[in-house]
Each structure stands twice: as C-alpha cells, then as structure tokens.
C-alpha cells in the first residue's frame, strides 16, 4: 500500500479541490494554514525565497483592512493570511514523488473538465468549469496547454499535440485577454529555458512558433467576430473609429476610468498627508466606501496592478508584490533542464507564472493564489536540491 506523508496528502487535496469546489479548497487551505502557524510558533522560523514579499503583502493587507475597513476584516484575512501556506515545510522526498504525478493529474483533470466546459459553452454561450467562470476556465486551460506541451517534450507522444491545440482553443473561447497574454509570455519563457538548456533545436523552435502563431491568428479572427472589444480594436486599426478616450475605455473594459479613479485617490492621499494610507493602503475592497468621480461604482479600482494594489495595500504591499515578481523570474530564468525529471520540476513553477502575468491588469490576489505559491515552494525545494 502506498504511504504518503501529511504534506503530500495536503498537496494532492489542495490541487484536486482547486478544480472541484472553491469552498472545499478553502477548507483545505485553512487546515494547512493552522498547521503552518503552529509550526511557525513552535520553531520560530520560516524559509523560502518569497518570504519578504509574502510578509509585506500579507501584513499590509490585514492591517489596512483592520484599521480602515473592519467590515471586510475576514476578507482581509483570506487575501492576506491565507498566503502563509507557502511556509509549509516541504521535504525533497515528498515533493519529488508529487512532481512526477502532478502532470498526469493535471492531464486527467483537464479531460474530465472538458465535457463540462463545452456543455456550458453550448448551453450558456460561455465556457465555464465546475466552479467559477470564463476567467477560471482560461487559467485552467492555459495551465493544461503548457502541461501537454511539456509532456510531449518529455515523452514524444503525438497524442499530446491535438490536446495542446484543443486546450489552446479553450483559452480563446474564454475571451480572457489577460490569460491569453499570460499563456504566450509563460510559453515563450519555457521555450527560452529549453533553448538555454540546449534541449530545443532551431527546427523544433520554429515549428512550435508556427503552430502558436497560426493558433493566435485563428483565435483573433474568431474573437473579432464575437467580442465587442476586439471589434472596436479592429475598427481603430482599420481607421473606421477614432483613437479616443471613449474607445480606449471600451477596449480596456472600463479600466481607463478606474485607472484615473485610482490615481486621483493616491494624489489626494499625498496632498492630505495620509501617511498611514500611503504606507499600508485603504484595505481590501476599498472601492466600496471610497469616492467614484468617473461613474465607475465597482468595489475595486481594478486597472494596472501598481495603482490598484497601492490603493488597497500601500507602498509596503506593493513592494512585497514586486519582490515576488522579481524573485520568481530570477529563479525561473536561471533554471536549466539537465535531466528528464527537471521538466516535472519546472511545471511546478508554471501556475504562479501564469498568475503573475495575468494579474498585471487586475489584482495580485486570487482565490487560488495560496496554491500557486505553495507549488512554487515545491519548485524551489527541488531546485535548491540540485545545487552542489
């Protein structure tokens, strides 16, 4: 009988529940968090390359919400403290076994979800998974696409090619531009790592590029017929519409308005010398109680993450996020695939990478962020083990 450690059980439970039920997932996050906090209090030490960033982000989130918007304190705990599961003390043996099963687990989940996604697309006109909406399905299938590509690269089984293209089509069906951007950036980052590792020849590189570019053109043509934002962009490119504020705001889904809202809030904080707000922000969902001069009454000032996060978490929270970005790309860009199992190791870093890119025009927090951080911790554990 296969025996698994407690940490392995938690890893599998978190991954599987992330695709089945957000409530179940959060239950496992809370359980993991309690174990982590107990361990921290007992041993009085934490480790991981993202530690400074997570501490700044989490503490500024909890403090600002407790002080300025206590009504949302529990949300502040969720967005801040839940990220502490990154500090779970993973061991090499635990992660090594998990990393080998992780790709096939994702592949199995991707196939199970497909009937659900296509049924909801047929029934409601939008592809959706078991829980969540088009954003989640876009993220899931960006991850699944990259998984099938890496599995093809390792196993050389051609069944992965049609699956890769099918999953790529689902990303375009989601019409989530942030996820399309995230997929292409992380995919080309993978090509870079493979090339620098001398695992990808010129012919293979250009063949993959041809498939991706062809898929992109097909996806763009489809979205240009179905999505008003792409239609507006095409009209501007073709000279049918002017490049003005109204059209830019339409293309950005109202984010231009929200960007101006956010900048005005920061400007007022500076003018009125609200140093605490500048330091730790106004709390999560600050848009629910703060002014909206441009008519956008959303609960968040969702535009470019630098402005969005500055308002909710201040300069400390923003610095924490920027630190996480820096350390992620530093670790990933320096990674080299020397052995076949290194492909499994690399895949553990992909979810956080996809999230970092897609969050540039939204917010850093996501319901599944604790899992992305923990998977990156697993990546670090195996990466550090390779050092002489």
UniProtKB/Swiss-Prot annotation:
Subcellular location: Cell membrane
Disulfide bonds: none
Entry membrane topology: Multi-pass membrane protein
A Gene Ontology cellular-component term: plasma membrane
Pfam families cross-referenced by the UniProt entry: Wzy_C
Ranges that cross the membrane: 15-37, 97-119, 129-151, 158-175, 179-196, 203-225, 304-326, 347-369
Source domain of life: Bacteria
Keywords annotated in UniProt: Cell membrane, Membrane, Transmembrane, Transmembrane helix
The protein, known as: Uncharacterized protein aq_1502
Native source organism of the sequence: Aquifex aeolicus (strain VF5)
């Amino acid at each position: 009988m296969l025996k698994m450690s407690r940490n392995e059980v938690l890893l599998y439970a978190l991954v599987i529940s992330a695709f089945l039920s957000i409530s179940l997932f959060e239950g496992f996050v809370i359980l993991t968090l309690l174990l982590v906090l107990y361990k921290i209090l007992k041993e009085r030490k934490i480790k991981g390359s993202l530690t400074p960033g997570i501490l700044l982000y989490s503490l500024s989130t909890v403090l600002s919400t407790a002080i300025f918007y206590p009504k949302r304190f529990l949300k502040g705990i969720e967005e801040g403290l839940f990220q502490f599961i990154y500090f779970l003390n993973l061991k090499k043996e635990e992660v090594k076994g998990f990393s080998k099963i992780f790709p096939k687990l994702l592949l199995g989940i991707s196939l199970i979800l497909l009937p659900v996604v296509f049924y909801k697309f047929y029934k409601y006109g939008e592809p959706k998974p078991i829980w969540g909406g088009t954003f989640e399905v876009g993220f899931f299938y960006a991850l699944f696409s990259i998984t099938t590509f890496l599995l093809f690269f390792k196993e050389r089984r051609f069944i992965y090619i049609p699956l890769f293209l099918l999953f790529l089509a689902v990303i375009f069906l989601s019409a989530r531009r942030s996820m399309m951007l995230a997929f292409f950036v992380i995919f080309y980052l993978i090509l870079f790592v493979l090339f620098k590792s001398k695992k990808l020849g010129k012919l293979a590189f250009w063949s993959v590029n041809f498939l991706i570019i062809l898929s992109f053109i097909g996806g763009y043509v489809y979205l240009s017929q179905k999505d008003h934002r792409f239609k507006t962009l095409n009209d501007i490119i073709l000279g049918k519409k002017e490049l003005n504020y109204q059209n830019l705001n339409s293309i950005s889904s109202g984010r231009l308005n929200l960007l101006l809202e956010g900048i005005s809030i920061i400007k007022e904080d500076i003018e009125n010398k609200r140093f605490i707000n500048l330091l730790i922000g106004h709390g999560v969902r600050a848009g629910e109680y703060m002014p909206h001069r441009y008519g956008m009454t959303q609960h968040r000032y969702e535009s470019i993450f630098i402005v969005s996060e500055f308002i909710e978490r201040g300069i400390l929270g923003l610095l924490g996020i920027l630190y996480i970005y820096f350390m992620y790309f530093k670790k990933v860009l320096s990674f080299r695939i020397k052995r076949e199992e290194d492909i499994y190791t690399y895949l553990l870093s992909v979810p956080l990478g996809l999230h970092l890119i897609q969050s540039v025009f939204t917010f850093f927090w996501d319901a599944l962020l604790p899992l992305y951080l923990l998977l990156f911790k697993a990546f670090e554990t195996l990466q550090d083990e390779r050092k002489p």
